Regions:
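Short, well-ordered alpha-helices that flank and scaffold nucleotide-derived cofactor binding pockets
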Residues: 35, 39, 114, 140
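Basic/polar phosphate-binding segments, predominantly the helix-turn-helix DNA-binding elements
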Residues: 59-110, 127-152, 156
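Residue at a beta-strand N-cap/secondary-structure junction
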Residues: 71, 120-121
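Short, Lys/Arg-enriched, Trp-marked, Pro/Gly-tolerant hinge/linker segments that flank
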Residues: 1-81, 94-106
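Residue-level recognition of oxygen-bearing side chains
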Residues: 121-122, 137
Length: 158
């Protein structure tokens, strides 16, 4: 496998930072920049598996699934797992296959999709109650993940 230059490693991280629109996304992007720099320096990118860390991250995963609408920060999630943000981010990614920000976003969108189908609550109320800071961000993210707008999703109710 050809080794990427540090600048090539940072391109997807920079794109993610530009797309982030909340604290968790910004924090995560900053740590990914640091991780990419450390990886470029050491030449190693493999996270070491640790059963205790995995259990702690699993507890955080369950918490996010139970309350995805809660405002979260990477620092808070890492603290809850008794890990540094850097190690938490790496361990979370190894366990779940996605970053904490991506996982939270997916859970929020899943809950919103269920509510859109089961209730007549206004779309804006659902967006805010599920943890999105503004309606345009919700609409954009929903459309990207679900392939249609929230309104179109609701109209397709069975």
């Amino acid at each position: 496998i050809p080794r990427l230059s540090p600048s090539e490693m940072l391109l997807p991280v920079i794109a993610a930072a530009e797309a982030a629109d909340d604290d968790l996304g910004f924090e995560e992007a900053a740590l990914r920049v640091a991780a990419a720099a450390a990886t470029a320096e050491s030449g190693s990118s493999e996270a070491v598996r640790n059963p205790r860390r995995e259990r702690r991250v699993d507890e955080v995963l369950r918490r996010i699934e139970a309350e995805p609408e809660e405002p979260l920060t990477l620092w808070q999630l890492a603290h809850d797992a008794a890990m540094s943000p850097y190690h938490f981010l790496r361990t979370f990614n190894v366990i779940s296959g996605v970053t904490p920000y991506q996982f939270v976003l997916t859970q929020r969108l899943r809950c919103a999709a269920v509510r859109l189908r089961r209730t007549t609550d206004p779309i804006s109320a659902i967006a805010y109650e599920e943890g999105f800071n503004d309606l345009s961000t919700f609409n954009r993210r929903f459309r990207r993940i679900m392939g249609m707008t929230p309104g179109a999703w609701r109209r397709r109710r069975p």
